Each structure stands twice: as C-alpha cells, then as structure tokens.
Amino acid sequence: MRKLIIPLVIVGAYFLMQSSCEQNNQNIPYVPVNFDINLNLPSYTSLNFPGEHLIVQGGSKGIIIYRYTMDEFVVLDRHSTFDVTLGCHVAVESDGITLSDESECSDSKWIILDGSV
C-alpha cells in the first residue's frame, strides 16, 4: 500500500504544479528594423546636434533616435515593456533626455542614455 501512495502523491503534486502555471508570454513583437538615415536631409537635421532626438516610423510602436555625442547614437523602440498587451508606447519628455510610458501603463520614467530610473 505504501508503494502505491508515494507515486500517487508525486503524480498529484506534478499535476497541481502544472495547473498553477500561467502561460502568459508577454513579448514585444519581433519586428526587423533596417534603415539608414542621411543627416544632410532636412527631415533629419535635428540629429545634427548632440542631445537632440527624432521619432521615426518602424519597429513595433515607432523608433526613437537620440544623438548622444557627435559619434554616438541611442536607438530605442517605443513599445512599452510594462504590459505588452496594453500596447502603450514610450514618449520623450520635454527635457529631451527622460523617457516615460503612458500613465495608463505604469507612468515609469527613465533616462534615455542608459535606461536608469
């Protein structure tokens, strides 16, 4: 009898653990991005100066291009990672260096340069 109880407990525990797991994969959609920008074109002139940003179409919800230095750019997708199912997007605050997602999501704010909060 004891030999029968132990395997039943193990099998029961296994099914109990499996039923408690949620299959809630919240991944940002994979969207390949491949484009070039010509800084001599009028639509990209704001990127000729460090500290400036530009929002362009592409990616999942758009792309933010930020000119960090004369030689470095930071490029981010605008899709908020808080709750992907809500479809919120990231915006650049008026100071030009802080990013935030919509208040309906998490109203989080972070620095565009390194992602620190």
Where are these regions (language model features)?
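N-terminal pre-ligand scaffold of iron-sulfur
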Residues: 22-96, 108-116
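Multi-pass alpha-helical transporter architecture, strongest
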Residues: 104-105
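Sec-dependent bacterial lipoprotein signal peptides
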Residues: 1-21
